[in-house]
């Protein structure tokens, strides 16, 4: 929970504000246990010296048969650890596991001006397939668009 509060505070690219991280320890534990007990979801945790520094996950897109081939991918990493290849390793691992779980395509949403993330996603084979204008509205009243990206597994 502390990790979520820190990552949401240090970057404008995540969907929540720090004060919106309101889950209890029990709720977070239940969420993690659901990931551990599912063959259709994965949460990969990156640690350094026993401290949580990042995570990467995949989850099904809905629970419909016609969507069974699709998964959503998400990643977050403390800013101080960006640029060292940790995110790339986590994404490669998660994408491999998603394919092994039977998914045929991975999807994600990224803020359009997050060029470092977009460059990484493109390096891993993701392609942009659309833009959602004014996807997020910040406290200072400005908006950010988001790109939708997809990769065949």
What are these regions (language model features)?
Residues 89, 93, 97, 119-123:
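Structural preference for long, well-ordered alpha-helical segments within the folded cores
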Residues 45, 57, 72-76, 85, ...:
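Conserved beta-strand segments that form the floor/walls of ligand-binding pockets within enzyme
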Residues 71, 111-118, 134-153:
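C-terminal "cap" of GNAT-fold acetyltransferases
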Residues 91, 98-109:
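Conserved GNAT acetyl-CoA-binding A-motif
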Residues 60, 107-110, 122-142:
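Conserved catalytic-core motifs of GNAT/GCN5-like acyltransferases
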Residues 1-22:
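A short, well-structured alpha-helix characteristic of acyl/acetyltransferase catalytic modules
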Residues 8, 20-80, 91-92, 152-153:
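Acetyl-CoA-dependent GNAT
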């Amino acid at each position: 929970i502390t990790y979520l509060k820190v990552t949401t505070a240090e970057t404008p690219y995540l969907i929540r504000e720090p004060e919106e991280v309101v889950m209890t320890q029990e709720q977070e534990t239940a969420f993690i246990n659901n990931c551990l007990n599912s063959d259709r979801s994965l949460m990969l945790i990156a640690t350094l010296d026993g401290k949580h520094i990042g995570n990467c996950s995949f989850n099904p897109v809905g629970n419909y048969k016609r969507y069974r081939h699709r998964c959503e991918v998400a990643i977050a990493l403390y800013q101080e650890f960006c640029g060292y290849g940790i995110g790339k390793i986590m994404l490669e691992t998660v994408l491999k596991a998603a394919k092994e779980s039977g998914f045929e395509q991975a999807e994600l949403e990224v803020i359009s001006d997050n060029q470092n993330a977009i460059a990484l996603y493109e390096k891993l084979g993701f392609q942009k397939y659309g833009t959602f204008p004014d996807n997020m509205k910040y406290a200072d009243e400005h908006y950010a668009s988001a790109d939708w990206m997809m990769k065949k597994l």
